[in-house]
Amino acid sequence: MTSNKKSRLPPYQPGEHVSPSVHLNCVLLTTTVVNFLDLFQLSSVLFALPNIQQALGFASEDINWVLIVYNITFAAFLLIAGQLGQRFGLEKIFIAGTATLTISNVINTTAPNKGALLAGRAISGVGAGLTAPNGLAILSNTFPDPESRNKALAIYTACGPLGSTIGTVVGSHLACMSGWRSIFWLCLILTGLSTILACLFLPRFAKRKDMPIDIPGTVVFTAGVALLVYGLNDSSRRGWTSAAMLTGIILGVCLLFVFLWVEAKVSNPAISSYLWKSGPFLVMLVAIFAFGGSFSTWFFISTQLCVNLLGYSTILTAVYFLPAAFAAIASGVFATPLIRLAGEKNILVAGLAITAAGAVAWAFAGPRIGPAVPTTGRDTAIIFVIGSPVALVPTQSILLREVEAGNHAVAGALFNTAYQVGASVILAGANALMDRSRANVQGVRQVTIDGYLNAFWLIAGVLGAAALTVMVCYWPGKDDLVERQTEEANAVGPLAVDKVDTSKDATASARSVADTRL
């Protein structure tokens, strides 16, 4: 249930002195910038790994830990972050996350050795894990009616691909021109500014003291996700016959099953029991698992193909993906009108189908095309990425509608966990396919074009299966949909984004929030 108590803005906040519409947009800007940075910080070091390896003495088989450790802590801390946000206030945990990101980048910029850098990257993952679920919950509670929420989610979602792409462009340029540490200096500046924005513009959210933290379930879930993500990410380094890798995966899966058992026994489960019985909620988790995993895998494989096989420079490779990132923003603008015109289910299926078509197009884009490769790669990237907001906006909207407003942070945690675990699972599968197609090139075993193409076919198959799953398994009930949308439009969220005015009653405050538009 949502609290009817009005929240108060700290007196130092500009939100106390501006119109509700301006304040709404400032909240959207703050959460979107941090979402952008979560992916920017991951992709920006991708092409700087050789420089880092040489400077800090990483072994060639260990350098990927700069990426892996970020993924592990990011995924592992999502559920606890969602619960902490609901218990102590969404904005408090969000600000704690941005502050953690800032501190971690201080460590990264000054890291004297590889241990210090890995520690800093692990802390960065914790910060990202604290911000991701609470940022989504902040938006869903700030924009309670479906139309304005979908507009906000479209903008929020579109900046994800932009963060990945601009991260590769900026990171590769800085690594070549100013050294790899300059990447973390830039991240330090941006995360510091994000912390200031969050302190200035995020209102206070109601604390849910009636929702104690599920400590046993959270501990088991965190350990299970961490081991699973570790094992899957390490498979590309150790191979599928490694005892350490198999142990991590098996223990991770077993702990996640134990988590389900714990949730059925405890009196205060982290994930409310009604969610496990919600067909639409589970279908949306499958959709985000498939889409998130496919997008992350596609981005990694396509950039590696351009650099390792086609011989492009890192900067040129990154630039080729820029049009796709801006195309995602353009498609995000049209996501909400399309949903209103054709319905959430149809647009979701269309978004998954578009990205699957983009993966199929990539499966035909190889060196055999000759001079057309740059143009073809750019165009196929646009096809793939343009479906991102089209698929994610209805997915988020449907998922959040199945959840009580007070549980949106945990729902956001599950959303992001499905995304991260999907990325690890599908990338591991793609790496296994590529490893089967290696050949000796000048004494070095490299992945052949057939290996990359097989990986793109895997991505297309996963996305196609997800589209079919949504078509077959998700059937929205018209009456239930209207009822839920009416409840949301009339709800008094835990957030009062208008100026504090004690002379107005809670009903008037709720009406001002529900009527506000972007």
Swiss-Prot record:
Q: Which GO terms describe its cellular component?
A: membrane
The UniProt record lists the keyword Transmembrane helix: yes
Q: Which PROSITE patterns match?
A: MFS
| Coiled coil location | none
Could you tell me where this protein is found in the cell? Membrane
Provide the GO MF annotations for this entry: transmembrane transporter activity
- Which keywords accompany this UniProt record? Glycoprotein, Membrane, Transmembrane, Transmembrane helix, Transport
Which residues are reported to be glycosylated? N233
Give the bilayer topology: Multi-pass membrane protein
Q: Which domain of life is it from?
A: Eukaryota
Identify the CDD domains for this entry.
MFS_MMR_MDR_like
Transmembrane regions listed in the UniProt entry? 27-47, 65-85, 88-108, 123-143, 152-172, 183-203, 212-232, 242-262, 281-301, 315-335, 347-367, 380-400, 409-429, 455-475
State the conditions that upregulate or repress this gene.
Answer: Expression is induced upon voriconazole treatment. Expression is also induced during germination.
Could you tell me which InterPro entries the record lists for this protein? MFS, MFS_dom, MFS_trans_sf
Its job = Major facilitator superfamily transporter that may be involved in A.fumigatus adaptation to azoles such as vorizonazole.
Q: Which family does it belong to?
A: Belongs to the major facilitator superfamily. EmrB family.
Q: By what name is this protein known? A: Major facilitator superfamily multidrug transporter mfsC
